[in-house]
């Protein structure tokens, strides 16, 4: 039968009633580290989960578990014991009454392991747990050369980024249904929207975001089984398809651990203006995919799905320093802030005596870098002037111009979108904005280190997406708690009526 909606106020009353019953003057007591967990779930309203999943339940049959309580229990699992599995978590719900109460269950009346996985399937909403079919042709094993310390793998196909961007310019990109769309819609409406209203994402009319990829190891080696009996017949190397347990995964290079791994390449987009480094959009790619290739797909998908504001700037590291990426972001009306990946130490020559440094800064005939002097929007060009002038004063020993305000020079964005950025790399504004790029790295660190993302031991893209999104929900819950903890007095509220 259909689940009955339990409002967040009803959940809060249930928590008060159960804590007063079991933790007031009895054997069970609450310690100081319990209160942050209680407060985090107290401020998190996910009652709409029941409305979202109502269509997945039939009109007849036994009464189901409250979907909001199931999701709340999984979030509590990630907040307290993310390294264990669901089976052990059910044991924890029986062992610790507080966990059952905070989930929304009465102590002793706990859902089983199968009930949790049934809930995950309803939350997922698709028949397929992976993008690719499990039965595929046998993958060829190639001996891969180990890369140097800190070195990252390069794209397999040279020029692939430019080809993808040109294809997007030529044919466009219609919004297609992705396997993670249901989770993102829920995450955006129930978590991103709340954080936005609290002012935790930054200015929504001019939002800054940062993107970066990180390895997600799901297994050390690919696992597969034969679909034929050739081995029994003595045929060792047959070409029949094999059954892969993780068809969406492949092998890639982890530059931080300096080893090859099997799994995904998680590309994360986070808010660079958020003081809590809050994540916005995750995308799982094959492990062999390069950051620049992942960005092309992730940025287009994010621009089609994010509806809470307008992205004005995108902060990326030097791995994304490709001319095609600048053109793509400019086409999406997003200003790129990308660190240069030095390809030469020589200056570029121009039609006059001015040269251009590898960083895109004009250099006068005296060998000094010029300073930015405003951007002309009408002609889409950046103005530069002599760095030794201040007003009408010029302290240069060999001035290269007799102009009253010193030598000036203009660079046009259309000439080289990579070198001549709208905001000059040498300006203080660039440095102030770009120093927030590491916010996405801190966000990834929280997911992988604090919440033990790779401890999932899952075998399907479905479960990895559910784990990732729920960890992102926990990151937002942590931020809400930090904003509201000074005004929360739960101890007085819960035990005020007990003597």
Annotated model-derived regions:
Residues 430-499:
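Basic, amphipathic alpha-helical segments enriched in Lys/Arg and hydrophobic/aromatic residues
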Residues 73, 89-90, 107-119, 205-216, ...:
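Short, conserved catalytic/metal-binding motifs centered on acidic residues
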Residues 1-70, 76-79, 107, 119-187, ...:
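Dynamic "connector" segments at or just before major functional cores
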Residues 93-94, 353-377, 413-461:
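Short amphipathic alpha-helical "interface-anchor" segments enriched in bulky aromatics
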Residues 85-104:
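DNA-recognition alpha helix
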Residues 91, 124-314, 318-331, 339-341:
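Polybasic low-complexity intrinsically disordered regions
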Residues 219-220, 228-230, 234-244, 252, ...:
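Long, low-complexity, polar/charged, intrinsically disordered or flexibly structured peripheral segments
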């Amino acid at each position: 039968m259909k689940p009955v909606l339990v409002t967040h106020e009803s959940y809060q009353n249930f928590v008060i009633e159960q804590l007063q019953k079991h933790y007031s003057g009895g054997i069970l007591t609450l310690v100081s580290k319990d209160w942050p967990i209680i407060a985090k779930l107290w401020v998190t309203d996910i009652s709409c989960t029941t409305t979202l999943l109502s269509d997945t339940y039939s009109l007849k049959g036994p009464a189901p578990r409250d979907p909001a309580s199931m999701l709340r229990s999984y979030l509590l699992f990630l907040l307290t014991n993310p390294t264990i599995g669901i089976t052990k978590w059910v044991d924890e719900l029986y062992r610790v009454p507080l966990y059952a109460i905070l989930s929304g269950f009465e102590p002793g009346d706990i859902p089983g392991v199968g009930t949790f996985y049934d809930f995950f399937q309803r939350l997922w909403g698709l028949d397929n747990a992976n993008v690719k079919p499990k039965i595929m042709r046998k993958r060829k094993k190639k001996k891969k050369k180990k890369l140097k310390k800190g070195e990252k793998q390069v794209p397999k196909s040279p020029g692939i980024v430019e080809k993808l961007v040109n294809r997007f310019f030529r044919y466009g990109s219609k919004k297609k249904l992705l396997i993670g769309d249901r989770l993102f819609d829920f995450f955006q409406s129930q978590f991103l929207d709340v954080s936005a209203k609290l002012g935790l994402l930054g200015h929504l009319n001019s939002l800054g975001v940062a993107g970066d990829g990180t390895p997600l190891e799901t297994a050390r080696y690919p696992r597969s089984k034969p679909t034929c009996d050739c081995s029994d017949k003595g045929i060792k190397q047959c070409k029949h398809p094999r059954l892969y347990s993780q068809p969406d995964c492949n092998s890639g290079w982890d530059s931080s651990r300096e080893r090859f791994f099997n799994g995904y390449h998680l590309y994360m987009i986070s808010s660079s203006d958020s003081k809590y480094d809050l994540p916005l959009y995750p995308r799982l790619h094959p492990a062999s995919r390069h950051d620049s290739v992942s960005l092309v797909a992730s940025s287009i998908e994010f621009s089609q799905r994010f509806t809470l504001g307008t992205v004005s700037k995108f902060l990326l590291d030097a791995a994304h320093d490709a001319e095609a990426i600048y053109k793509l972001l400019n086409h999406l009306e997003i200003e790129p802030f990308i660190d240069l990946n030095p390809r030469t130490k020589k200056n570029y020559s121009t039609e006059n005596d001015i040269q251009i440094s590898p960083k895109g800064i004009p250099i006068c005939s005296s060998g000094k870098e010029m300073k930015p002097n405003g951007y002309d929007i009408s002609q889409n060009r950046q103005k530069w002037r002599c760095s030794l002038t201040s007003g009408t004063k010029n302290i240069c020993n060999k001035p290269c111009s007799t102009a009253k305000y010193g030598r000036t020079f203009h660079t046009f964005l259309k000439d080289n979108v990579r070198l001549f950025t709208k905001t000059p790399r040498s300006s203080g504004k660039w440095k102030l904005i770009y120093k927030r790029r590491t916010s996405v790295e801190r966000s990834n660190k929280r997911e992988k280190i604090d919440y033990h993302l790779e401890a999932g031991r899952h075998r399907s893209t479905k479960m990895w997406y559910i784990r990732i999104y729920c960890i992102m929900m926990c990151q937002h819950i942590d931020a809400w708690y930090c904003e509201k903890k000074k005004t929360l007095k739960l101890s007085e509220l819960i035990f005020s009526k007990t003597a």
